[in-house]
A protein has these predicted regions:
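Short, charge-rich amphipathic interface segments used for partner binding and complex assembly
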Residues: 34-67
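Short acidic DE-rich linear segments
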Residues: 1-3, 67-70
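N-terminal acidic leader/helix
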Residues: 1-29
Length: 70
């Protein structure tokens, strides 16, 4: 997959879904704040530029949904 290729919405939703699964499996509350923390931790641990982009966009998506689509 080309790194310059546009990130698909499915990739963002998958990243959020994986973060949700992590929170549920470990007994943490499923909140937007916790999701953003998990996505940030995954971003820090990731070494793949494309995955970092997907995770960053997923955090931005959650932030927009929390604060409204301005």
């Amino acid at each position: 997959m080309n790194e310059d290729e546009q990130v698909r919405p499915q990739e963002i939703h998958q990243a959020i879904g994986e973060a949700s699964n992590y929170l549920m499996e470990h007994g943490f509350a499923l909140t937007a704040g916790n999701l953003k923390k998990v996505l940030l931790a995954q971003d820090i641990l990731s070494t793949e530029p494309r995955q970092k982009t997907v995770l960053s966009l997923a955090r931005q998506f959650l932030k927009q949904k929390i604060h409204g689509d301005n």
